[in-house]
Design a protein with these regions (language model features):
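Dual-mode signal for accessory low-complexity, basic/Gly-rich regions
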Residues: 92-197
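Short N-terminal signal/transit or membrane-insertion segments
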Residues: 62-93, 161-173, 181-182
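Internal alpha/beta scaffold segment
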Residues: 2-86, 152
Length: 197
């Protein structure tokens, strides 16, 4: 990964590339696939653009997010709130709870009809991939949001049993001596047929 910094007087802007977006279960080929070298010039230009850009307007507008910001948005606004142990209150003293409640599953409009989010830990190239979660459930692709509607939450076998609802195979522990927790893995915004422009 790398960071590019642009500075003029008391104003500094920076852009970065790599980090978590380059975490894969791959080797050297990830650098070629990511066009790592070619990206350096683009990041430099973006840092200068940020440095010289006008301040963002403060009125209400429609917003289209580019992929690099969309990754974070999905992680924070969809992933964590849909972890069933948070919904059940298990995380309230550590990482907080969720605005999502059990009665919202199947009844909540999470976004526009264009929003389709899948959970897919079966993708072999991704860092958060596995065949079975730590509750022994088989990992497979599942829609959690389809056409903007919340269909299911991210809850492993134990949380599913406690809540009496269907979830996903996402119960994972970071060690044999720690309890498994419901954690997102490989959330994907499914491609539609709308052009970015």
């Amino acid at each position: 990964s790398f960071i590019v910094t642009a500075n003029e007087g008391a104003v500094t802007q920076w852009r970065s590339f790599g980090g978590m977006r380059l975490v894969r279960q791959q080797g050297w080929e990830i650098l070629a696939d990511s066009k790592f070298a070619e990206t350096a010039e683009r990041m430099g230009n973006e840092a200068v653009e940020l440095l010289t850009a006008d301040n963002c307007p403060s009125d209400t507008r429609d917003l289209i997010l580019a992929p690099d910001q969309m990754i974070l948005q999905i992680h924070e606004s969809i992933g964590h709130p849909l972890e069933l142990d948070r919904i059940l209150g298990d995380e309230r003293n550590y990482a907080g709870t969720s605005f999502v409640t059990q009665d919202m599953i199947g009844n909540y409009k999470y976004g526009s009809d264009l929003l389709n989010i899948t959970f897919d830990p079966s993708r072999p190239e991704e860092a958060a991939s596995y065949a079975f979660d730590d509750d022994g459930l088989e990992a497979k692709k599942e829609f959690i949001i389809r056409n903007g509607n919340l269909e299911r939450v991210l809850g492993g076998g134990i949380s599913q049993f406690r809540a009496g609802i269907e979830g996903t195979a996402n119960s994972r522990a970071d060690s044999w001596r720690r309890p498994a927790m419901d954690r997102m893995a490989n959330l994907n915004l499914e491609a539609g047929d709308t052009k970015f422009e």
